[in-house]
Amino acid sequence: MTEDEKKKIILQWREKDLQKCLYEKDFMSLAKSKIESWKNELVNVAVLGRTGVGKSRFINAIRDCQSEKESDYAPTGSTETTSTPKAYPHPRNKLLQLWDLPGIGTKNFPRKDYIRHEKIRFYSYDIYIIMASDRFTEDEVFFAEKLDESGKVFIFVRSRVDINLDGVDDMEAEVNKIRKDCEEIVKTSTVKSKDVYLISSKLVDHRYLDFPKLIERLVEKSSGLKKEAVMYSLQYNTKKMINGKAGALESRLVWTGLKAAFGAAILVPDLSLTVDYRSISSEMEFYRKTLGITDSDLQDLAKITGKTVDVLKHEYKLQTFDIFKITTKDVTELGMQFAPYLKHISMSEALESTVKSLPVISSALGFGISFATAYCFLRSNLHLMLEDARTMFDILLKETGSEILYIN
């Protein structure tokens, strides 16, 4: 463990949190709160634009809803299908809600009344997608300036670019032309954020378009627990997203280590320490799902690349698909799976280094060795899983040129 890592861990264990542990003896509630609070965070994303710009298609695409038969599919069409704001929850997190707002400038929602309209609740959302399917107009600029004045987060999106590219020989040149045209309009506004993202909701992995960057921007524009909620919920990986998840997952290690050391702990065979196997297995499954390295993800990548799962594992030296597979919820059987690895960790230099770097936990809480063992075990496996996630993304980029990977 480097000095920077030690400092990072110590900073994570804030004095007020330690005091809470010591005096309230409520270790599990505090650890659970630190790990799971994002799940209770409501995030409202408004999709705003004129009728027919593709708001519903975008909402379906970002939630991977592909069929009209799906119960939460957002109706699409060139005429106005939305007469009142409607929320579409993300299937992975019902509290991440994509709002389809009525079209700007229609008979029922003229621009002059739009902001004040009681149905719209214009300033009640966390992030705004301002969408146009052709040139941006005074309407989009007007709403952006109002949001900017109020300190609201918004993103300009030029949709349906695939239509412009149909039959075009030089797609890159055409995309640059469209981008320049959009940016010239936006630059006339007073808003600080003038970036425009060009997308196709039908072709999210188009090599010349910005859907991957838009996903990244949605995370970057969020903060605190809302940022965690958006990052953990969106089912797409990009290189930047994986790096962001790495930092977020590493920041959980102290709390998951504490939870594993203190909650429903069971003696590890041949060792004088106890751990909660269920906490460890649950956290590792969360890593797999968050990083997109489940068996289903690997099978999908195999289909995309035309290679078998076994070939991908061997050719690219994927490390974590055949280790620590949780095949049971029985605590005794879990113990048999984990015990050899925990024993190895308990005798490693990494464990000794971790205990020394966290003397306040080791001495004050009385289960330093158990904590350090769980912490080191989870950290070691997280790093292996991150390597596999990055490798899978590199495979996609190499084999297809795509810079965005859907995860299950």
Model-based region annotation:
Residues 128-133, 156-160, 199:
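Conserved beta-strand segments of the P-loop GTPase G domain that flank and frequently precede/overlap
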Residues 228, 232, 236-408:
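Alpha-helical membrane association modules
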Residues 160-232:
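Canonical P-loop GTPase G-domain recognition
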Residues 76, 97-113, 156-159, 164, ...:
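AAA+ P-loop NTPase catalytic core and its hallmark functional loops
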Residues 1-106, 379:
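Conserved G1/Walker A P-loop phosphate-binding module
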Residues 123-127, 150-154, 191-195:
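Short glycine-/polar-rich loops that comprise or flank the Walker A/P-loop
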Residues 80-86, 96-148:
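Switch II of P-loop NTPase G domains
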